[in-house]
Amino acid sequence: MDTTLPPPQHMEREPLKSKSSLLPMTRRGNGSKGQKILLLTNHFRVNFRKPNSHNFFHYSVTITYEDGSPLLAKGFGRKILEKVQQTCQADLGCKHFAYDGDKNLYTVGPLPRSSLDFSVVLETAPSRRNADKRLKLPHQSKKFNVAILFAPPEIPMEAIANALQGKKTKHLLDAIRVMDCILSQNAARQGCLLVRQSFFHNDAKYFANIGEGVDCCKGFHSSFRTTQGGLSLNIDVSTAMIVKPGPVVDFLIANQGVNDPFSINWKKAKNTLKNLRVKVLPSNQEYKITGLSGLHCKDQTFTWKKRNQNREFEEVEITVSDYFTRIREIELRYSGGLPCINVGKPNRPTYFPIELCELVSLQRYTKALTKFQRSNLIKESRQNPQQRIGVLTRALKTSNYNDDPMLQECGVRIGSDFTQVEGRVLPTPKLKAGKEQDIYPINGSWNFKNKPATVTRWAVVNFSARCDPQKIIDDLTRCGKMKGINVDSPYHVVFEENPQFKDATGSVRVDKMFQHLQSILGEVPPKFLLCILEKKNSDVYEKSCSMWNCECIVPPQNLNDQYLTNLLLKINAKLGGLNSVLDMELSGTMPLVMRVPTIIIGMDVSHGSPGQSDHIPSIAAVVSSREWPLISKYRACVRTQSPKVEMIDSLFKPVSDKDDQGIMRELLLDFHSSSGKKPNHIIIFRDGVSESQFNQVLNIELDQMMQINHHTKFFQTESPNNVLPGTIIDSNICHQHNNDFYLCAHAGKIGTTRPTHYHVLYDEIGFDTDQLQELVHSLSYVYQRSTTAISLVAPICYAHLAAAQMATAMKFEDMSETSSSHGGITTAGAVPVPPMPKLNTNVASSMFFC
């Protein structure tokens, strides 16, 4: 057999000039398979009275202090422009405007002049000399200069009308951006927190405590969409995590789960509090936290300028505690033994006792949520379809968009009814267990029972002294017998860790365990290891994953059958088995995939947790099918890349004229070696990119992609339940030109089903619409960790898992803590991008990510 695989001719990279002409493909027609069904969707019809008679005018905005220095504080631009609107109506020609909070302002029609300058005074404005004064007086005033300058070209509103009529227009995205800016301005006037196109009211009735000092704030997303059915307003429920407002000390106690302020981990607290805003009692003046003092309040000194008997200033060293208790006559109950809050600059700190500081409302919490918080968030976010319909109806009414002055100037009126669309429920794909037993899923799920599978040549290694490994083995064997799975006895029963190494590093502990295994088993290693760990995120995990094909578990106290069944599913997949396959894989009923060598690829880039993505490398994970004609078995290739880079930069990595060390070559070689053939067809699913990146991805990665991060929902017209699994929509609210569709492959048992939005960017294989939709639907049934259909295709889920597992193994989350600190301000240094550790050959070719 030919073991080499030169890059196919058609995969050679073309010059940028020829690739830059690629655009997303147009729709080839709608699908017809499946039972038709009428649905409602959370899109509301938008009517234009005179779309051809107006242009949007774009102006750049510059805000400076009175001395010409720029305004740097975020969030105050809107207040300043609101003041301009209130006090300078005549100069503005009585025109309304939409301001994006930064440097862009839009009007319907022109302002009286192309260049306008204003001076306004704002009460309680942010001081640019935040650290120049020790104390702020309440109700301080600041004068600002505002320059508004016309920034051509004009944006014709008819671009939207032209797009809806099927005409090409280069101003469509600009016009929609202005319309969305008007929606944001509407929310800003109500004092909402704005997060892209979502807004959140400062009202306690929208807050729900999810534990550890964090609230879930319920808000709404609103945006305009051009669809086959016309322009629509998409409204949906959104959720943001916010810091629980109130005393800083109370927040830290809750966040760290301690009983009193003297048990707080202040190193961790410093990272948590950075950049949060506080109001300081009794003045209620707001500041941004830059750090903590290095000493306790009773020991931290600063230089205070006081008047002597001659009315002259003299400098005196005084502690923060003494200053507030003796000079300001403010009683401090417990701050003396705690650090101070620093709101100053590195070279000139400004300290306040912590008990005088309260966190203000509507501040986003950007740290990773704990398991406890995630569990509570799911409970608080649940809304069945009828509840969501009611909430969205009230949200549209409360927003009162039809009375918005700018929307009125645009001639826009928004309907109050959910849009009715036609969908189809696709036939459920038939599955096979082994080669004989047929499985017919019901409502997107099936039983895992009497499925021919065997767990053999495995071993148990125990790194924990807190559990009974023999009980785990017995329960796993018992559960396997109930499900028809033969679980052989493991090697040597259990390999226990030598207690003398329990305090060693994870690398040493795993090496010693490996030597222990070799001394007993010789050169014939087990195919699979069940590693019992003492805790999650153990440093044993990293080395175990790179050396062994293993499943690392922290056993719960109650080993129920559901836990054991899920464990068996994962073990069987890691051992190279398949819990079920599509009938079409064995029968070849999809000729374009099953009768022509076809590789299916899933791509995703995983970034750090919110608030940490700037400091830790991103992980690109690509999975590919193997052993064609199977499309249920995959392997993964995972690489690191620079933080927040969405495009995968190592798909191709030529090191010479004849050698390439990129991801694609590695996966194509694996397909060739496992299938005995080179692929004629390549089908690629790409997750994690927005519509604005389609052209970039198309010309760099050339793929088919999906989007989970959208806000369209569907509701049955004659039932309060979720839509049926297999429901597909490819008309009305879909793109007016491009080839896209929505698919609800899974059965939504909790809350409201969220469909996956698929965009087909490029197709030279020649799928007809029904064939492609059937393939995508079927790929939601091949996820080996589950006995239910999942919401998106399995290759993408596997890419997510592979990236997450390797990120955990490399402990990237810990890298965000390694930053330099100076004067209370933490700054991240250059982010290193360490290479991914090389996996053992047997591990790399397995479904280790399951």
From Swiss-Prot:
InterPro entries: ArgoL1, ArgoL2, Argonaute_N, PAZ_dom, PAZ_dom_sf, Piwi, Piwi_ago-like, RNaseH-like_sf. GO terms for biological process: defense response to virus; regulation of translation; regulatory ncRNA-mediated gene silencing. Residues 518-811 form the Piwi domain. It comes from the Eukaryota. Keywords: Repressor, Ribonucleoprotein, RNA-binding, RNA-mediated gene silencing, Transcription, Transcription regulation, Translation regulation. GO terms for cellular component: ribonucleoprotein complex. Pfam families: ArgoL1, ArgoL2, ArgoN, PAZ, Piwi. One of its GO terms (molecular function) is RNA binding. Belongs to the argonaute family. Ago subfamily. Involved in RNA-mediated post-transcriptional gene silencing (PTGS). Main component of the RNA-induced silencing complex (RISC) that binds to a short guide RNA such as a microRNA (miRNA) or small interfering RNA (siRNA). RISC uses the mature miRNA or siRNA as a guide for slicer-directed cleavage of homologous mRNAs to repress gene expression. This is Protein argonaute 8. It comes from Arabidopsis thaliana (Mouse-ear cress). The lineage of its organism: Eukaryota, Viridiplantae, Streptophyta, Embryophyta, Tracheophyta. The gene is AGO8.
